[in-house]
């Protein structure tokens, strides 16, 4: 299968990767977040139009396999396992999250967030994630924190999220990897 960066339908997100990598690294620095020892298991996109999501899907189907397709928070989300990774900082992501547009509008179409796995009790996720971030970083103008518990129709694992954003890119923390969540769906 082809490398994702050579697929015509994915040309815009290939070109967007350096911007995302720079913005993510800058956000981590602002937050005092040492990303080196952390396991990030997937990367996610955002788009404004269904036609963009459909084009990206066609592209990912040429360079990976569909792991999961689910309705989460009222919109379709596909997960693809790529044959060649998306490289950001020291990470090599083989899983890409492709959500269709929802009610929220994002400032940029392209790469939007990474998801870091902090194994442990779901009830302690927020405290464990916040302990990795510098207080002075969290107090900076433009930094926002959000907690949520997104859930797919057949998911069996509680999957709370703590997200930290600067409005451009986001770092999300979860207690489970996305592949563990997908496996829990098959137990339904």
Report each predicted region and the residues it spans.
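Glyoxalase I/VOC metalloenzyme domain signal
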Residues: 2-41, 45-188
């Amino acid at each position: 299968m082809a490398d994702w960066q050579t697929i015509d339908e994915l040309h815009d997100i290939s070109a967007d990767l350096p911007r995302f990598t720079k913005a993510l690294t800058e956000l981590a620095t602002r937050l005092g977040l040492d990303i080196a020892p952390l396991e990030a298991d997937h990367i996610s996109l955002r788009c404004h139009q269904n036609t963009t999501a459909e084009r990206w899907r066609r592209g990912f189907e040429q360079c990976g396999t569909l792991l999961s397709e689910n309705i989460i928070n009222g919109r379709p989300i596909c997960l693809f396992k790529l044959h060649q990774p998306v490289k950001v900082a020291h990470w090599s992501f083989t899983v890409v999250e492709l959500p269709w547009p929802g009610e929220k509008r994002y400032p940029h179409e392209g790469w939007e967030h990474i998801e870091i796995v902090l194994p442990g009790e779901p009830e302690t996720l927020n405290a464990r994630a916040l302990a990795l971030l510098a207080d002075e970083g969290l107090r900076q103008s433009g930094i926002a924190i959000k907690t949520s518990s997104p859930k797919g129709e057949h998911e069996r694992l509680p999957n709370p999220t703590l997200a930290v954003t600067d409005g451009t890119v986001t770092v999300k923390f979860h207690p489970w990897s996305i592949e563990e969540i997908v496996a829990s769906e098959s137990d339904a």
